[in-house]
């Protein structure tokens, strides 16, 4: 899987770098991907060989992070439910994470139809994640 993904990325002329992550068999960061030219991770989770996950992380603004960190447990739960409901409505898996001291909302598309993972479907998924990243970013600006 890794060799195919690397070859497809090179064939498309996309800039990328390998990311070390013990949770994944491999992880590649595509630096400027999709319509919006955002950084996108392409990886195969260790517990799910043959599954390809495409994801991007929306970094919350400093004012949003400060507000989020000031939330009570109940308010955080309500906020996370709002984000989750929105992401479900645009058919993307999400995860709120803290990374490099910043709150981020990861948006992910899972490619689990092993027979149909190829260069075109991966590129389509990258474009899809790029678009859903933009929608999630705008959602956060409007509602938070």
Description of each model-found segment:
Residues 112-144:
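C-terminal charged interaction modules
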Residues 56-104:
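Short, internal acidic amphipathic alpha-helical interface segments
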């Amino acid at each position: 899987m890794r060799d195919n993904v690397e070859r497809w990325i090179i064939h498309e002329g996309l800039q990328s770098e390998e990311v070390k992550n013990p949770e994944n068999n491999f992880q590649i960061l595509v630096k400027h991907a999709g319509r919006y030219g955002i950084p996108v991770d392409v990886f195969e989770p260790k517990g799910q060989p043959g599954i390809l996950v495409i994801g991007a992380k929306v970094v919350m603004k400093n004012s949003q992070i400060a507000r989020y960190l000031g939330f009570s447990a109940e308010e955080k739960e309500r906020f996370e439910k709002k984000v989750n409901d929105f992401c479900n409505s645009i058919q993307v898996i999400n995860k709120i994470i803290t990374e490099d001291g910043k709150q981020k909302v990861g948006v992910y598309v899972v490619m689990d139809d092993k027979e149909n993972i190829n260069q075109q479907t991966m590129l389509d998924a990258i474009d899809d994640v790029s678009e859903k990243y933009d929608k999630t970013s705008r959602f956060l600006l409007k509602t938070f």
